[in-house]
Amino acid sequence: MLFPTEFDVIVVGGGHAGTEAALASARMGAKTLLLTHNIETLGQMSCNPSIGGIGKGHLVKEVDALGGAMAAATDESGIQFRILNSSKGPAVRATRAQADRILYKAAIRHRLENQPNLWLFQQAVDDLMVEGDRVVGAVTQIGIRFRARAVVLTAGTFLDGKIHVGLNNYTGGRAGDPAAVSLSARLKELKLPQGRLKTGTPPRIDGRSIDFSKLDEQPGDLDPIPVFSFLGRAEQHPQQLPCWVTHTNERTHDIIRGGLDRSPMYTGVIEGVGPRYCPSIEDKIHRFASKESHQIFLEPEGLTTNEFYPNGISTSLPFDVQLELVHSMRGLENAHILRPGYAIEYDYFDPRALKASLETKAINGLFFAGQINGTTGYEEAAAQGLLAGLNAGRYVQEKDAWCPRRDQAYLGVLVDDLVTRGVAEPYRMFTSRAEYRLSLREDNADMRLTEIGRELGLVDDARWDAFSRKRDAVSRETERLKSTWVTPKTLPPEEATALLGKAIDHEYSLAELLRRPGISYDGVCSLKGGECAPTEPLADDPVLLEQIKEQVEIGIKYQGYIERQASEIERNDANENTRLPDGIDYREVRGLSFEVSQKLNEFRPETIGQASRISGVTPAAISLLMVHLKRRGLGRRNGTAAEATEQGDGTVPTQQ
């Protein structure tokens, strides 16, 4: 049956990538259909009940700055909030929250059901409708055909998923949900390059059986309680709960070693590669054999359940081994396991077969986002989903794709890494992956992206008004500090000594004083009995006020470093965005080695910058390529791309 309504964009999958994709597409005005196998699992947290962390929190803030849902949903469902690396510089500080699974799903579903231009439909997708080299719709398991001009596929771990517990295995997309076997087979027919990856989850524990008196308590930050969204308020948070800490021990490790002969990972049953930075407990014991103990965090799953998530013991060992290893740890001697841990293998597709817009190179209008691209984590999925949904909407509107640059957003780093380098293991975001991380901080994600989001149609009036007030206040206050001066005559020596350690000997602007180590914005404003404070309040809202003060202080203190980084970006920008012709045959480029020309022909980079980051492509090869383009008159910063780069929005032409 052909469904009577035709849509602009169809999103397949209702996880973190799919929900952000559907919301982004609909916000742009595209008539969007979200197809999910089960409406009750929209926004499901399949593994850890947490959002954020180092690098990941930066992505969440960027999604929020572009009008996405993840940060706001976390503020409404978060039961513990912490700022990680709080004693370090602002570039690596990151927000992390424990979320109530039920509240998080409810917050996401509420947004989906109340988003204009968005329709929901519960049916698993078995097939894609493809005509020639373009996608035209999707087919459900009962044969309903939905037509659309673009499809965003966000299948998570469901593509030919196989669950392993010991040497037992069965098909499944996650525990309790069926795998997408037919869709996986159909995608194989499309000849898209693919592979297998693996991830896992720990057993869940009944909190009533935990002896908390033997555990170390880990409270969240309480003064103040952090928020994730730039529009968030601590009053939105539900009741706050602590986490708890225990440790593995030698007995635990002996139990695990004794079970490796029945581990699917160590008997060759699992072929997929697992995440390096979220390893199973079996991997930890094997890779860090000399380590006597590993920290395990017991994280509450929610306010209305006794279920706990033991972060650190992801495993696919047989259940009897899981039970024994849990009981070997302090405080868990009598723990009751509610759900066994398991590993899951699934299909992914080589992201080097994607454009930077996340559209597949082989099939026009087909976009991939999330774990299907070889990433791991809710945050990485949500960021890709927003970008894919945005660009699917722009595709059907015949507008240029938006592809954020590496110097513009962690989202740009994520996508560039995927489409140029590919993945050999599940990809996780870290701040260390960003070469311009001093400029790509959590605190300035809105300053970097909200204006772009507004131009793209992603940001509503409420967010834009709040951002505009903040941006203008930061600018005014920064200029005031630069133009307000104190002299030895106007600043009493005792007051200067109390703040600065000694009296001043010549004239200083307040900005120059603030630039000194250990001097805060509030400290500078307190000088001269408070006369150095602004005469008018920077903001009536206390949360907005703190954001403004933070931006002013960081901007002044790190001005020199940020300006140097901006100069470096400008130097690199000339070649970074030079577009490569679609039909170029790299075998014709004089001087290129066979290996380099083969890789360039295989991966078809879109820009010189992408080409330079392909493994094996040397700086010398890039120089030869630039000479070739100049001789042939082919190298160009495509009109739209060049203009967009100068405007800072990263738009590149859509090839349709």
Curated annotation (Swiss-Prot):
Annotated region Disordered: where?
A: 636-656
Q: Any idea which positions bind NAD(+)? A: 274-288
Protein name listed in UniProt? tRNA uridine 5-carboxymethylaminomethyl modification enzyme MnmG
**Source lineage:** Bacteria, Pseudomonadati, Pseudomonadota, Betaproteobacteria, Burkholderiales
Q: Which family does it belong to?
A: Belongs to the MnmG family.
Q: What is its main location?
A: cytoplasm
Q: NCBIfam families from the xrefs?
A: mnmG_gidA (TIGR00136)
Against Pfam families, the record matches this protein to: GIDA, GIDA_C_1st, SAM_GIDA_C
